[in-house]
């Protein structure tokens, strides 16, 4: 896959596959606070998906290709997402630029003068 970069100065629509984990939910919340339109899915509900949903973020429980029917500019996925995941396959079919959680985290960290690993 080619390298995908998000322009953090231009909020857009980002979909998170696996949004219910501690790391992905935190990244989703950061982008949401920066004015991005955030949505995502997870295999099961969690305190994190409930918290994001309470903020008005669209959360899908279950990962189905139909979840990507609304316009999305970027997809972020976790290492837990397999290449045969229906959403992963649909994002590729639609040509949506995709980046891993680690790639997004690295890009975000470059926006700050100091960071803690």
Question: Model-found features: residue ranges?
Answer:
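N-terminal leader/targeting and accessory segments in enzymes
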Residues: 1-104
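Phosphate-binding P-loop
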Residues: 107-113
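Hydrophobic alpha-helical hairpins/lids featuring a short glycine-rich hinge
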Residues: 115-117
């Amino acid at each position: 896959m080619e390298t995908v970069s998000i322009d953090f100065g231009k909020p857009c629509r980002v979909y998170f596959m696996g949004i219910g984990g501690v790391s992905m939910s935190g990244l989703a919340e950061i982008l949401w606070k920066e004015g991005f339109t955030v949505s995502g899915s997870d295999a099961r509900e969690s305190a994190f998906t409930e918290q994001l949903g309470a903020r008005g973020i669209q959360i899908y429980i279950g990962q189905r290709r139909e979840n990507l029917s609304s316009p999305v500019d970027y997809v972020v996925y976790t290492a837990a997402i397999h290449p045969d995941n229906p959403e992963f396959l649909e994002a590729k079919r639609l040509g949506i630029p995709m980046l891993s959680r680690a790639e997004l985290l690295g890009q975000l960290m470059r926006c700050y003068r100091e960071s803690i690993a």
